[in-house]
A protein has these predicted regions:
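NAD(P)-dependent short-chain dehydrogenase/reductase
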Residues: 118, 145-202, 206-215, 241-244
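Rossmann-fold cofactor-recognition segment
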Residues: 36-47
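Active-site helix of classical SDR
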Residues: 139-142
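N-terminal Rossmann NAD(P)H-binding glycine-rich loop of SDR-like oxidoreductase domains
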Residues: 3-23
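SDR active-site strand-loop-helix element
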Residues: 6, 30, 63-69, 104-110, ...
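Conserved Rossmann-fold NAD(P)-dependent oxidoreductase catalytic core, especially the SDR/UDP-sugar
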Residues: 91-133
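NAD(P)H-binding glycine-rich loop region in Rossmannoid oxidoreductase-like domains
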Residues: 45-85
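C-terminal substrate-binding subdomain of Rossmann-fold SDR/epimerase-dehydratase oxidoreductases
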Residues: 189-304
């Protein structure tokens, strides 16, 4: 099987590429940066001409479309790039899919659940009026609508996955990255950070996420949507406390605030469907995964 992974150098894309290659697939990688490596193609998915080049002289059985601008704050500060990469990027990929007929796996986000309160099963959008709370969430929901419309009009075959708070080694720090990445980096460097006391998450270790993503290639059910999440539902303060405890630091630099506007407060995920169809397994607990992630950041950023 020949597979293309867009965003294949990213925090989720790179380990997914390794997992797919470990299974013996022929994997091509597309990303926006200049890089070297086997079967690497530079591409900004928001530019149609560059997307076309991914398919010159080669075909793929499955495209994992991960390339996107990530995160709520990033989407507010760089909204032009967010909409170009996410909305136009998916439309560009769908145009190629409509012409060439490959199957696609699309990574959406738990942010699409917006202001929904309760257990997040994949079908809640069909039963409840939901308001997405920020531009990043809106683009991901737009992407899902684009994909469903293409399937209805052209018969394209896509599986959508909604990732929940994926964390682990390999995610470089920036102020726009995920909460665990930010907490670890800022605690390591004695920098202040904010903990939102009324926010809860279902965190997923990267190895568990990519193993389930890779399983889709051989268990492909067109039109399906899956939550990929961990089994541990926790508040954000628990994450901060665990990280500080591992590092042997106090919380003097932590500001505690009740909640953050324009952000989904509670993400209680149901992952039963992914367990049933994709053999999703939550094998790494926070107690195991956080020390591994901290050790990686210490090595990368030279902190002890």
């Amino acid at each position: 099987m020949k597979i293309l992974v867009t965003g294949g150098l990213g925090a989720v894309g790179a380990p997914l590429v390794r997992e797919l290659r470990r299974r013996g697939y022929e994997v091509w990688v597309a990303d926006r940066v200049h890089a070297e490596g086997p079967n690497y193609l530079r591409c900004d998915v928001g530019v149609y001409r560059q997307v076309e080049r991914l398919f010159e002289d080669r075909t793929y059985d499955v495209v994992y479309h991960l390339a996107a601008e990530f995160g709520r704050r990033n989407g507010e500060d760089f909204y032009e790039t967010l909409w170009q990469s996410n909305a136009i990027g998916v439309k560009n990929m769908l145009r190629m899919q409509e012409d060439l007929g490959f199957r696609m796996v699309f990574t959406s986000s738990s942010e699409v659940y917006g202001d929904y309160q309760g257990e997040m099963t994949e079908d809640v959008m069909e039963k409840n009026p939901i308001r997405q709370l920020n531009d990043y969430a809106i683009t991901k929901w737009v992407n899902e609508q684009q994909i469903m419309n293409s399937a209805d009009r052209f018969g394209t075959e896509t599986v959508r996955v909604r990732l929940f708070n994926t964390y682990g080694p390999g995610e470089p720090y920036s102020e726009y990255r995920s909460v665990i990445c930010q907490f670890i980096y800022r605690a390591l460097h004695d920098l202040p950070y904010t903990v939102y006391l009324d926010h809860h998450r279902s965190s997923t270790y990267i190895d568990d996420t990519v193993r389930t993503l890779a399983n889709i290639a051989e268990n492909f059910k067109p039109g399906e949507v899956y939550n990929i999440s961990g089994d541990e539902y926790h508040d954000i303060k628990t994450l901060s406390d665990m990280i500080l405890d591992i590092l042997g630091k106090d919380d003097d630099l932590v500001e505690y605030v009740k909640f953050e506007a324009h952000n989904t407060r509670d993400k209680l995920a149901s992952n039963e469907k992914a367990k049933r169809d994709l053999d999703h397994q939550c094998t790494v607990t926070l107690e195991e995964g956080l020390p591994r992630t901290i050790a990686w950041q210490k090595e990368v950023y030279g902190r002890e």
